[in-house]
Amino acid sequence: MKIFIHLPTWLGDAVMASPALYAIKEHFKNTQFILYGSLVSTALFREFPNSKIIIENKQTRYKQALSLRKELGKIDLSFAFRSAFSSKIILHILKTKQRYFFDKNKHKEEHQVLKYLYFIENSLSIKAHFKDLKLPFKLKFQNPLILKNGKKILGLNPGASFGSAKRWDASYFAKVALNFSQSHEILIFGAGKAEQELCNEIYQILKEQNIKVKNLCNKTTIKTLCQNIAFCDLFITNDSGPMHISTVYKIKTVAIFGPTKFTQTSPWQNQNAKLVHLDLACMPCMQKTCPLKHHKCMKDLKPEKVIEEIKKLSTP
């Protein structure tokens, strides 16, 4: 049997779809999977059992689908975890016998993990037994990029791919790191040009204070990103893909929320996570940039509040 799966585009969504993917795998044993999607989502599942990985070419996706139809041959079943119309066209071109499409308007107020699980459960008339986030990587912990030297590791993740509205101020991240620098060594995570600027700003503030810090922005693959997040003792993050990766490994996490719905994208079933957010009338706006131009949901959320939550996490 051959199953084609169009993965979610964003890293965080792909992580949150993992229980649903493993529900498919559990239901269809000894099946060949074709995992198709963005560079980051396919990298996340590169080691998924019995799978062929295909990176989607957005510029020529329909021409690519025609080529795949010849290359892959008969596909018995397909699932699109994206609700975009382009997914419907791709699966139509592939001429899959049975096709199932994720509808983002169903279960609108549920957590994204449950939305994906309900999609698979309802499509296949099954009940998923496994609801934890899971990634297929076999991680190695004996050779970390940074040695503890008796200290714990504090990870900072100042970026968020969705847009600037989700990003807490770089100076705030630096202030939190300074507060815990006596007991922790610092790792900074990020990817892309915009996040490089944020990470560099934090790095410079900390280096000027002679703090031991390593800037990993744009220096990791998806697998080594997971490796290093899993090695952290504490993780401070915006609502982002790396936040969900920290949840996979049940890392002590403080998740900072502003314009997005924490009820839908909060760290899933991680008892080691604390959410930090304000309660402003304009929240959640769900916009990439602040429509009111003041960005108070993040600017008025001061480092002291995050430090307070970290201390709660650190208390036995």
From Swiss-Prot:
Pathway assigned to this chain's UniProt record: Bacterial outer membrane biogenesis; LOS core biosynthesis
Species name: Campylobacter jejuni subsp. jejuni serotype O:6 (strain 81116 / NCTC 11828)
Disruption phenotype: Mutant synthesizes a truncated LOS molecule, but mutation does not affect the mobility and intensity of the high-molecular-weight polysaccharides.
Superkingdom, natural source: Bacteria
Keyword Glycoprotein belongs to the record: no
GO molecular function annotations of the record: ADP-heptose-lipopolysaccharide heptosyltransferase activity
Pfam family, one: Glyco_transf_9
Protein name: Lipooligosaccharide heptosyltransferase 2
E.C. numbers: 2.4.99.24
One Gene Ontology term from the biological process aspect of the record: lipopolysaccharide core region biosynthetic process
Keyword field contains ATP-binding: no
Catalytic activity: an L-alpha-D-Hep-(1->5)-[alpha-Kdo-(2->4)]-alpha-Kdo-(2->6)-lipid A + ADP-L-glycero-beta-D-manno-heptose = an L-alpha-D-Hep-(1->3)-L-alpha-D-Hep-(1->5)-[alpha-Kdo-(2->4)]-alpha-Kdo-(2->6)-lipid A + ADP + H(+)
One Gene Ontology cellular component: cytosol
Record-linked CDD domains: GT9_LPS_heptosyltransferase
Family statement drawn from the similarity comment of this UniProt entry: Belongs to the glycosyltransferase 9 family.
Keywords (A to Z) from UniProt: Glycosyltransferase, Transferase
